[in-house]
Amino acid sequence: MSYDPKKIDLFPTLPGVYLMKNEEGEVLYVGKAKNLRQRVKQYFVPGRDGRLMIPYLVAKINYIETIVVTSEKEALLLENNLIKQHKPRYNALLKDDKSYIALKISQNDAWATVRLVRYKGTPEPDGLYFGPYTSAQAARQTLDLLNRLFPLRQCSDQEFARRTRPCLLYQMKRCVGPCTQKCTKGEYQQHLDRTIKFLRGQNKDVLKDLYEEMRLLSEQLEFEKANHLLRTIRYIEKTIESQYVDRPLGHDADAIGLFRYGEHVVVVLMIFRGGKLVGSRHFEFDNIIEEDHELLTSFLLQHYEGATEIPSEILLPSKISDEHPVEEILSARREQKVNLQIPQRGEKKALIEIAQKNAEALFKTQKDEATLREKTLLEMQELLFLTNYPTRIECFDNSNIAGSEPVSSMVAFTDGLKDSKRYRTYRLKIGSKPDDYAAMYEVLTRRYKRAKEENDMPDLVVVDGGKGQLNIAIKVFEELNITGVDLLGLAKEAGRHDKGMTAEQVFTCYQKEPILLKANSPILFLLQKIRDEAHRVAISFHRKRRSKKTLKSALDDIPGIGPAKRKTLLTHFGSLKKIELAADAELREVKGISAANIEAIRTFFQGRKE
């Protein structure tokens, strides 16, 4: 039943948020308005709103909920929270499943270090983060530079606790030796403060500090230390000079570009820190009914809520209606003023144009790649006589060594791309005797018995192997009474066991002889990619299983360490090597480990060395 627009006449004329829901109660869209009645009415006036997706949205609306607030700022915050909570299909929602790289300075360490870390979504609030960087290489280059300039410790906490004399880095003047009290807390903090300033682009402040310290050392006749500082100063000045070429800004800023094609939107974020372009990120949105100014507002609130840093200036491609409330919210999060600007000329305008061109180029590239993938899948359907268009493909591979720890993997590809959320690994229950057919029978039965119950069938199933493995798949599907799923077996050409792009045989259910695909076939390339991914996942899982078994076997030999304590130790430390290197104080932190157990652990590892 469609929504009756007459109900809107009862809506308040106050600012607030509205939630459009379908018959099942699913939230389809969340919006905000200065005047709820006036804004919601616009959706139901024919031709009033020209956005293509509006008729589709309106046709699905069964109920509209409104929430009145006291200000535009409150409406913005509530809208952002409701979008994150309900994940409406027609709103722009940032996904947090990507992994990002940053430099982290822990705030919990007495002697803090700079570490390269990866995180998803919002990072842990236990340190200062600098980034994200576009690549691990860029982050490592920055970390290497910091290690050359500022002598902070680089060792692990375990190594730091065990040190009785300084390491080689101390002799090289790359560390001030806090592990053996070669410096005071105040001296170490001074180096840490300079590191933070440098990462924030406050190079002039760092140089000023270093020049002042060098002057004091010279007055105290500490010429060797003063000379070392001078070398550091020259290195920083040289680094700064080399960066002027690609430093269009003199401060922290982000430049945002946006490209829209119908209801598909690409947003590009160019990140400048200390005036230098340190990276860029892109975000894609589909089925978006929000106008550009609404999408930009939503993007700003979502992105900078979980960002490691908020710059002092954000450059936008177009005006947003909620500019001042958004500035207030971002300034409160940063605890310093944040300016939103729409540049009209000069260098800043040029940066926005570059971001816009990047967004457009990215969209066109992805569109071309999507077209090629679709063409390959259509050719696969035709050439391999598939009943279904292979939107979702699942592939299986088994792994064992002489029957030990047999496992299987299942990988999934959707529209020709990895769909890692659907990956599965299986510990097999077959006996110790190697039997690839029994392994394939077990894993296929387990997977598709459940898939049938959950109505979660793929379009195509690929098994790694020839006619024999395909026959196992056919048998399983017949026993489970499953129809409508295509089955293929993939095997190298008879007599060929080499790696790489070689001709392969594809076995189908419809003909006795295999189909031979040429080495340069895009269909073969995709099938090999899927099969190799299944093999990689199976091998990785098998190694993990064997590693755990080896760890358990090794710890079995320690007197007084039973199954419960063994499991606790492995859970706490993660590896045999870390248990061996752990200090007594760290071992005492493990629940249930006594002084006698620690002595037994020490004796055990000492015996292994001898």
Swiss-Prot record:
UVR domain ranges (all copies): 204-239
One Gene Ontology CC term in the entry: cytoplasm
Cellular location(s): Cytoplasm
PROSITE patterns in alphabetical order: GIY_YIG (PS50164), UVRC (PS50165)
Presence of the UniProt keyword Repressor in the record: no
Keywords assigned: Cytoplasm, DNA damage, DNA excision, DNA repair, Excision nuclease, SOS response
Main location: cytoplasm
Top-level taxon of the source organism: Bacteria
Protein name as annotated: UvrABC system protein C
Organism this protein belongs to: Protochlamydia amoebophila (strain UWE25)
Lineage summary: Bacteria, Pseudomonadati, Chlamydiota, Chlamydiia, Parachlamydiales
